[in-house]
A protein has these predicted regions:
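Sec-type signal peptide cleavage vicinity
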Residues: 2-6, 15-342
Length: 342
């Protein structure tokens, strides 16, 4: 691969005269400009966008590298023809000779064009996971493929590098069978690690070796559909497992507490490209006692799809509850019913 960025201006002049840009000579070598299209590998979606669905937004920008010299070239998505074009025409990627070249791409792009960015330091916080716009910066996407001068039209199939967790609260009933009205819910996910890295060259996101076990907090309301959503670094869950803790103040000013303990045997890890979705049914037992959240069924689908149904017995606070993790690759949906603490 030759570094031909400095010759792109000449190519542009040649294009004016020849009317097409797939047979231009650079210092005696024929070159072909690479064209890019892209898709996001995800099976299921509710909110269709570059980070949660299967389409790109017009104007989205990615980084593409080809071979040993054309590194970190920024391309912008054009919705009209489902293609990416170089932001800087002088830096667009061309292929010379008959070799096969490795092509990699990642989103969102960082650093400067022409230089390989360092491994990115990642810190997940309650603040940077609070809204879809803030979370978008942490849903890293990565693609890799091959390209030749004979086959310069390259399709990039992006995969999610992170794990995703969705905790959706739905209204249950009170002791008389009346529906519960959901108000603001304060929700915590406890037992996760929040610090690590994303390697733009390999597409691997990982927790740091010394990352501490921590928690994340979100306030849930009608604006976010009472759904706690975070992007997390793929990781092995610690021996203590995970806990979901929540509290809601009722219309008559009572405070209802919810709790779910997920043992590590049921959810041992979070995998890249997997979304783990839990549906939590918020009942009101008309008491001040904390309420244990219990699982009544599961539905697993990667950002591959596996379905599961369970009807566990009611358990007291601190006892096990089934909540099997699986494959965004695979999403996991858990239906959970709270029972009054004994």
């Amino acid at each position: 691969m030759k570094n031909i960025s400095s010759m792109a201006a000449l190519a542009a002049l040649l294009l004016v005269s020849c009317g097409q840009d797939t047979d231009v000579k650079f210092a005696g070598d024929e070159g072909a400009k690479v064209t890019f299209s892209a898709s996001i590998n995800e099976q299921n979606s509710q909110d269709v966008s570059r980070v949660t669905g299967v389409t790109w937004d017009d104007g989205d920008e990615v980084s593409i590298s080809c071979g040993p010299t054309q590194k970190n070239v920024f391309y912008r998505y054009n919705a009209a023809d489902n293609s990416f074009t170089a932001i800087n025409r002088l830096d667009e990627i061309w292929l010379l000779g008959n070799e096969e070249y490795d092509v990699t791409a990642y989103y969102p792009h960082v650093g400067e064009e022409g230089t390989v960015p360092p491994v990115q330091i990642v810190e997940i916080t309650s603040e940077n996971q609070d809204t879809p716009e803030e979370r978008a910066a942490f849903d890293f996407l990565y693609a890799s493929t091959k390209a030749t001068k004979a086959e310069p039209n390259v399709h990039l199939n992006f995969n999610h590098a992170m794990s995703r967790v969705n905790l959706k609260f739905v209204p249950g009933t009170d002791p008389e069978g009346n529906p519960v009205t959901l108000t603001d819910i304060e929700c915590y996910l406890v037992g996760i690690k929040r610090n690590g890295t994303f390697d733009t060259e390999t597409g691997v996101a990982a927790v740091a070796e010394d990352a501490a076990v921590s928690d994340l907090r979100q306030m849930l309301n009608a604006d976010n559909d009472h759904t706690f959503t975070v992007y997390l670094l793929p990781q092995t869950i610690g021996a203590e497992g995970l806990q979901i803790e929540a509290a809601m103040t009722t219309a008559d000013s009572r405070r209802i507490y919810y709790f779910l303990e997920i043992p590590v045997s049921d959810w041992p890890e979070m995998k890249a490209g997997y979304s783990y979705n839990y549906t939590l049914t918020a009942n009101d037992y008309m008491t001040a006692s904390p309420t244990v959240l219990e699982i009544s069924g599961t539905d697993i689908n990667p950002w591959t799809e596996v379905n599961k149904e369970e009807t566990p017995d009611a358990k007291a606070l601190g006892t096990e509850a089934k909540a099997e993790g699986s494959e965004w690759g695979e999403m996991e949906t858990e239906e959970i019913i709270p029972v009054e603490k004994q």
